Amino acid sequence: KYTSQLVTYGQEVRKAFDTLTSNVSRPVSINFFSLYVNEAALLHQIENAIEKAKSYELFMAIMLGRNDEEMNELKTIASHASNDERFTNVVFMVFDATFGDDNYERFIEYMANAQCASRHNLADQRAAHDKNAQAMISDWMKEVRRSNFSVYVKGESETFSTMKLATAVNVGIAPKVFSRGAETLDLLRTRAPKTFWKNQQAKETAKNILMFNTYDEIIGKATGPALPLKFLFQDAVDDNLHWKENVDKENHPLYLVSEFVSRKIKNADKAKEFNLAEKFIELTRAPYGLFPSYAGIAMLSFAMRPWINKIYSVDGKPRLAQHLVDDVMETFKSWENGKPSNKITFTFETKEAGQLSKLLIKVFKLKSLKTYSDISSLKDARWAISHEYTAEKGY
């Protein structure tokens, strides 16, 4: 019999930790663990839970012990595991408040009595025993809130008051895991309200960043919950949205996300099609951790600005700013759903192809065709010549 019986009995433990983490800015994946058959089996449980969490969530392994012996063993396991590359982005939390062996025996007795009453259709007695068991867990959670917990992440450990769990996560723990995430900016983290970090499809933010061309225009449109976006941009770009000379190229998330996107596009095979969600999927993982929110959508939108008119839909049309707004939103949708989207599969046009396209437009006067004059790529030009131009000339 394992302490996990306590954690999974009813909703008391889940409710307690939902409350403790309610002010954590980043989405979290809360998972409860206790001593199991052996250390390897416990770590395997954690590995399985990681696979079910979203890559941008802060994975919290909440470890609770029945007694001090269990608690200390959990600390040893957490300390070792935090140095294991399999758990490099896992936040292990071991709580000092234990349930107690005597309480555990009473709890088991309540559970057994509840099951016995249930088998004999004694609903009132079953409910009474169940209520007593739940009350014991509720009291334990009160002790947990009043005590301390130890955090183990990336081979380092710290101790905090449980009442300050959310602050500890926001200030020191989440930025350690998502070191290229928006929460690494002190001003943004301390001044942005919870609504700023809310998981949402902030399309208006994508539109403003891709459609306007000055800092004042973009920030002027960032009102209400989006207002803190100014803290994301103010130390990174000038009035014309160019990088400031003193931008922190090692740490500023806006710069790092933009560099990632630029590197991926520049190094892509220009002869092959290019899917934004697939090519940029690493942005959803640590150390970036982009998710659909004001900050996440703003960073990807800004990173796509240099590629306006430079990537093409599969029919040969260039993606203008208004198109990229939809493309950014579709990319986040694809990530969130975990499903590929053909809507964001694009191609490139080489320098030579662009020059040939312009030459064909000039030689054959393709812009003056009556029925098809919106020509913006070599593919367009070829189609116009073989269909519209030849038809008009009577070939």
Put a short name on every predicted segment:
Residues 1-395:
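Extended alpha-helical scaffold and adjacent linker segments that couple domains
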